Amino acid sequence: MKKYLALALIAPLLISCSTTKKGDTYNEAWVKDTNGFDILMGQFAHNIENIWGFKEVVIAGPKDYVKYTDQYQTRSHINFDDGTITIETIAGTEPAAHLRRAIIKTLLMGDDPSSVDLYSDVDDITISKEPFLYGQVVDNTGQPIRWEGRASNFADYLLKNRLQSRNNGLRIIYSVTINMVPNHLDKRAHKYLGMVRQASRKYGVDESLILAIMQTESSFNPYAVSRSDALGLMQVVQHTAGKDVFRSQGKSGTPSRSFLFDPASNIDTGTAYLAMLNNVYLGGIDNPTSRRYAVITAYNGGAGSVLRVFSNDKIQAANIINTMTPGDVYQTLTTRHPSAESRRYLYKVNTAQKSYRRR
């Protein structure tokens, strides 16, 4: 609610986050909430464009952490896919001071997404004794950064040696870019291995599949958000997959945003949904490999859309799949599924899962 309120407040003062919904149950409340969220995201993007200039809009997404401060004049952007951290400011006075504060805060921030509002300029980032980026970034001496003194020294080094500026026609943008360590993805994945193992045992879902879904959905970014309001490491949507899981567990309502931003809760919910897809929605598929391909695709686009690739009748669809080889099922889903995103998704997750199985 805090994020919705912040967006609603800045729109009139200043005159956007996966697009696919998990599951097939489209209800009026979900559509209303999602449409409203999408409108607010569009307003937010427009506001940023007014302040920063054309083609300078950067907004948080599944694999991008973006936090604005200083009346939206300074921003920190972590690209978890590319492994880069870019701190920028358009502050007209003392830009180096604005950058220095943002560098230190970003390097030392914790891993509690529920405490940070990515859609306001409130400086709500707290310095943590266990920084989220610890081990994923090293300073100019090759050391990981845990304490404020080392972060401050590194910030001074960056401002002296790596400060860049560019004029976009509206503003002068000052920036520094930090490269994360080459194995930053593995470093993040390691943080969640215990939670993944626990969920794997609880629901009977292969660890490698959970990790592959997490990598594909968020690149292990606990702050992950999307324009469809999918949240957290496994990009769970409250009103669809989240609601289905709660109902299966005898709980009413839907998981809260803070619940889904908690890594352990997010992994548990996402894994529970994978188990539902495997055991309930797609349980009629006999071959485990064929069923895995269907489950992966369904996690992105819904079980119904997977079955409809083969037949409009769900039972008949399962029967058709059961006459096919796993290779033919894979080929069909990656070429005939109506969603290009879902076709690519199966390829990405299957490829990632192979890499985790080899470890």
From Swiss-Prot:
Name a single GO cellular component.
Answer: cell outer membrane
- InterPro entries registered for this protein in UniProt: Lysozyme-like_dom_sf, Murein_transglycosylaseC, Murein_transglycosylaseC_N, Transglyc_AS, Transglycosylase_SLT_dom_1
Q: What EC number(s) does its UniProt record assign?
A: 4.2.2.n1
GO MF annotation list: hydrolase activity, acting on glycosyl bonds; peptidoglycan lytic transglycosylase activity
Q: Which UniProt keywords apply?
A: Cell outer membrane, Cell wall biogenesis/degradation, Lipoprotein, Lyase, Membrane, Palmitate, Signal
Is the keyword Lyase in the record?
Answer: yes
Highest taxon of source: Bacteria
In the record, which residues receive a covalent lipid, type N-palmitoyl cysteine? Answer: 17
Location(s) in or outside the cell: Cell outer membrane
Bilayer topology annotation: Lipid-anchor
Reaction(s) catalysed (UniProt annotation) = Exolytic cleavage of the (1->4)-beta-glycosidic linkage between N-acetylmuramic acid (MurNAc) and N-acetylglucosamine (GlcNAc) residues in peptidoglycan, from either the reducing or the non-reducing ends of the peptidoglycan chains, with concomitant formation of a 1,6-anhydrobond in the MurNAc residue
The cross-references to Gene3D superfamilies, in alphabetical order and at most eight, read: 1.10.530.10
The keyword Cell wall biogenesis/degradation appears for this protein: yes
Family indicated by similarity? Belongs to the transglycosylase Slt family.
Per the entry, what this protein does is:
Murein-degrading enzyme. May play a role in recycling of muropeptides during cell elongation and/or cell division.
- Tell me what this protein is called: Membrane-bound lytic murein transglycosylase C
